[in-house]
């Protein structure tokens, strides 16, 4: 019984060390994700993130639950600590599992329905939380659906409050929002709601530490963006002016222009709805006019999300990206739903028509009208893949020219356009001023992280100021001012080398880091440049993370070993206590007891002491686990067996005069003559 109890303590201790973030009393233990198809066979131990997922209850009265999936790197680099990034996909009504499993999350899904590692996962730069919202999207559910952006804001702020109740250790983290497409409406509205909440806190509430917004190919200003379909299509070579449908497309474009001119009031009070069917028709006509009916069925239409690709008509990109064919069955597996701790095993769909049909965005002002007030407090980054039609970069540039923020309209005319260099290659170009940064990403689609995982992750470095600004040689052998970002950990190692080289007369000038998050009004172009470019060095930070992980494992092993030794020691003491024989000698007249030991036991104790001293602790532990008799060994007797001397049971007579001796050492006799030992022979 005692052994079982001690083993139970050992197992519980091991679990406590193996899962330090959870316990029976910790509510987030219910959301811990420990298994997924392929997690242990395809993902290395050091690449497996700490994961939590589930449907978090917001309102019990109407069964509103938001599904989230959180990823945390177990070997965080210093720059990534205390940072939480909430990712939202668009739609409206499209699941953020697109972002988790096809873009910025640590996993992609292969044809076998198993997770494989994404080398460009954003969770290496901060904790990633992918949320299905509004209710009804993906794995989220409710009896009621939201109808406008104000409702969505209220519910997401409620989700954040519940989320940080579940993860109080993250409540003070720097918070960033990232997403794409219709998240260009969601994210500014939610950010505005958070900033207003922070100014009107109730008793006991704490502010959310909102630091910045990152919107990729966002649907932000419907007026200007709808007017960009035709100019972009012509510039990209998608359609030519000699197309037979050109005149009808031009007329539709003019109708869209008339709507925009009529409703785009300067004060934002009389604005067009977020989605205009008249303007949407322009894009539909372009896709119809460029259809190639002689091509294979799956290549007849231009992909509206990446014009370099083709798709079937009238899908025109709805079947893209190809990973969707793997993600959908994966998320519909009952075992996966169990792994993700789902309460309601609803059938997952990428986009919910029910949510989209319930949503009436015409009751909400387009998010662009919230930009001026948001930019007064936090930075916004707009990044665009240059191959996207539906939310193209020309539309983004168009509404920025008309936007007034922080005392000025549009970017300054003399503002430099800087190259963005990642890992010694030009990845795009950047403009930044007065808290607003625009990044055009080369060779990328509507879903930038899908096409450029590692490059897209470095966008986090830009918004957090983790970059260098310097002159770099371009293809024309001309030096051009550039923003330079690096693979994970490289910049820190580079800075360390430069710091050490400062003592040398030949050291180069260290670049000045510029942070776009500073509300100083200074652009990225005001930073000091380097005299020469440094090539990227191997990631010392990666080696540091590896060494730290090894150190953590050794520490954990030592802690576990200490527990084992302590339990073993307790067991030894307990066994010794239970095996100690009771005294069979009465006390003397003075009340002192006589110490009794078998004579041969004394000899054996001496031998055992010598033997045990020669053994190591591991050998003695193994001997103990083998179950040796802790009571000692008695010398054999001749004749009939004597059994229980203490209980006086089963004792039989001897026919042999040879008996075992035991020694009686009297405390009284020792007091009388401490130099003499009296020995006395006693018959059993």
Curated annotation (Swiss-Prot):
Query: Any idea what this protein is called?
Result: Pheromone-processing carboxypeptidase KEX1
Q: How does it sit in the membrane?
A: Single-pass type I membrane protein
Name the species this protein comes from: Debaryomyces hansenii (strain ATCC 36239 / CBS 767 / BCRC 21394 / JCM 1990 / NBRC 0083 / IGC 2968) (Yeast)
Q: Where are the transmembrane segments?
A: 557-577
Q: Where is the composition biased (Basic and acidic residues)?
A: 651-661
UniProt lists the family membership as follows: Belongs to the peptidase S10 family.
Per UniProt, the keywords (alphabetical) are: Apoptosis, Carboxypeptidase, Glycoprotein, Golgi apparatus, Hydrolase, Membrane, Protease, Signal, Transmembrane, Transmembrane helix
Q: State any GO BP term from the record.
A: apoptotic process
The GO molecular function terms of this record are: serine-type carboxypeptidase activity
Which Pfam family, an example, fits this chain?
Answer: Peptidase_S10
Stretches of Polar residues bias are at 510-538
Instruction: Give residue spans on the Cytoplasmic membrane side.
Output: 578-684
What Enzyme Commission number(s) does the record list for this chain? 3.4.16.6
């Amino acid at each position: 019984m005692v052994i079982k109890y001690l083993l139970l303590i050992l197992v519980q201790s091991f679990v406590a060390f193996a899962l330090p973030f959870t316990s029976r009393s910790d509510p987030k233990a219910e959301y811990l994700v420990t298994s997924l198809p392929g997690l242990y066979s395809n993902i290395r131990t050091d690449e497996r993130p700490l994961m939590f997922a589930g449907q978090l209850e917001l309102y019990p009265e109407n069964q509103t639950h938001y599904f989230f999936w959180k990823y945390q790197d177990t070997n965080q680099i210093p720059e990534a600590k205390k940072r939480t990034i909430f990712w939202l996909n668009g739609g409206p009504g499209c699941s953020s599992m697109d972002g988790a499993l096809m873009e910025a999350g640590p996993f992609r899904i292969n044809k076998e329905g198993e997770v494989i590692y994404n080398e460009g996962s954003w969770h290496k730069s901060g904790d990633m939380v992918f949320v299905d919202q509004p209710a009804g999207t993906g794995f989220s559910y409710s009896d009621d659906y939201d109808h406008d952006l104000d409702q969505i804001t209220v519910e997401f702020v409620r989700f954040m409050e519940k989320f940080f109740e579940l993860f109080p250790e993250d409540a003070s983290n720097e918070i960033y929002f990232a997403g794409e497409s219709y998240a260009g409406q969601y994210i500014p509205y939610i950010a505005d709601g958070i900033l207003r909440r922070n100014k009107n806190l109730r008793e006991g509430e704490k502010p959310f530490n909102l630091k910045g917004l990152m919107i990729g190919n966002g649907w932000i200003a419907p007026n200007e963006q709808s007017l960009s379909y035709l100019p972009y299509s012509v510039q990209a070579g998608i359609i030519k002016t000699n197309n037979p449908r050109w005149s009808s497309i031009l007329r539709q474009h003019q109708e869209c222009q008339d709507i925009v001119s009529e409703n785009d009031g300067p004060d934002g009070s009389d604005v067009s709805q977020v989605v205009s069917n008249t303007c949407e028709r322009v894009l539909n006509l372009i896709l119809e006019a460029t259809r190639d009916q002689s091509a294979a069925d799956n290549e007849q239409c231009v992909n509206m999300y990446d014009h370099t690709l083709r798709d079937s008509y009238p899908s025109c990109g709805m079947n893209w990206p190809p990973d969707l064919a793997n993600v959908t069955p994966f998320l519909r597996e009952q075992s996966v739903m169990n792994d993700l701790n789902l309460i309601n095993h609803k059938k997952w769909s990428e986009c919910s028509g029910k949510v989209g049909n319930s949503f009436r965005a015409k009751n909400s002002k387009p998010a662009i009208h919230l930009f001026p007030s948001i930019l007064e407090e936090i930075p916004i980054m707009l990044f665009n893949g240059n191959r996207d039609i539906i939310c193209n970069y020309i539309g983004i540039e168009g509404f920025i020219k008309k936007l007034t923020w922080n005392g000025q309209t549009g970017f300054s005319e003399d503002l430099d356009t800087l190259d963005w260099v990642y890992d010694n290659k030009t990845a795009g170009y950047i403009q930044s001023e007065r808290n607003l940064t625009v990044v055009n990403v080369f060779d990328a689609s509507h879903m930038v992280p899908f096409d450029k995982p590692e490059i897209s992750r470095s966008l986090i470095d830009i918004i957090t100021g983790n970059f260098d600004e310097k002159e770099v040689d371009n293809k024309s052998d001309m030096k051009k001012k550039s923003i330079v970002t690096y693979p994970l950990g490289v910049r820190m190692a580079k800075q360390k080398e430069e710091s050490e080289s400062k003592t040398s007369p030949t050291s180069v000038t260290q670049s000045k880091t510029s942070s776009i998050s500073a509300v100083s009004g200074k652009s990225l172009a005001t930073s000091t440049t380097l005299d020469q470019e440094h090539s990227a060095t191997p990631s010392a930070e990666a080696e540091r993370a590896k060494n730290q992980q090894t150190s953590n494992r050794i520490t954990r092993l030592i802690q576990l070993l200490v527990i084992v030794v302590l339990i073993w020691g307790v067991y030894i003491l307990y066994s010794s206590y239970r095996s100690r024989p009771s005294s069979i000698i009465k006390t003397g007249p003075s009340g002192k007891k006589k110490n009794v030991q078998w004579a041969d036991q004394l000899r054996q104790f001496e031998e055992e002491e010598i033997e045990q001293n020669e053994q190591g602790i591991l050998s003695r532990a193994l001997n103990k686990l083998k179950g040796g008799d802790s009571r000692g060994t008695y010398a054999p007797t001749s004749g009939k067996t004597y059994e229980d001397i203490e209980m006086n049971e089963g004792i039989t007579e001897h026919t042999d005069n040879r008996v075992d001796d035991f020694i009686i050492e009297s405390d009284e006799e020792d007091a009388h003559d401490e130099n003499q030992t009296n020995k006395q022979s006693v018959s059993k």
